[in-house]
Amino acid sequence: MNTLKKIVEFIRTKLGSAMAKNLSVEEQYTAAAAKLLDKIKDLKTASVKSINEEKRIRELIVEKNKQAESKEREIRKLLSEGQDVTMHAKLGLLYRRTAEQLTTKADGYAEMRIEIAKKVVELDDARQELAVKLEYIRETRAANALGISTADDVVEIAALTKVDIEDTLARVETFNGNISGVETTSADVQEYINSLK
């Protein structure tokens, strides 16, 4: 699988180089603007989807807390009867820890939407800058068609060819959160049982 990824990246790099050499400055800027628009759309879509995901996770938090409370009542009852509650305590502790981790994940979605909004503004600024450069290129081409050209125009066009699309897109961060595994030690279980006495 790793070899396949390397082959795909190699082909993408070679095609990108060949296309860059054969595309006009205007075509390169148009492609860059299209990539920026696609990335903005992807970010906005991720933001909308994160709202529903956060809502779903918040509902799970409520459910896990209810399960923990129920298990704690059961543990207290079993403790009063003098029974071993180690496994029940492990389960109760797992419910609590899962709820805590889900809370962290849900809060992360809210923070992610703030970051997405900032990145969308940055990308839109870059898109607007590209739009101005495209307009300049088109106007210069129209002026050249009329026979009007200056050395400054030629220098400016040459400077505009140095746009680095990948640098602009690299500023976009990937948002991905994972819940880490939960490990319960015997000390955690004992501390949990003692807190319920």
From Swiss-Prot:
Similarity section: To E.coli yfdP.
Identification of the protein by name: Uncharacterized 22.0 kDa protein in e-segB intergenic region
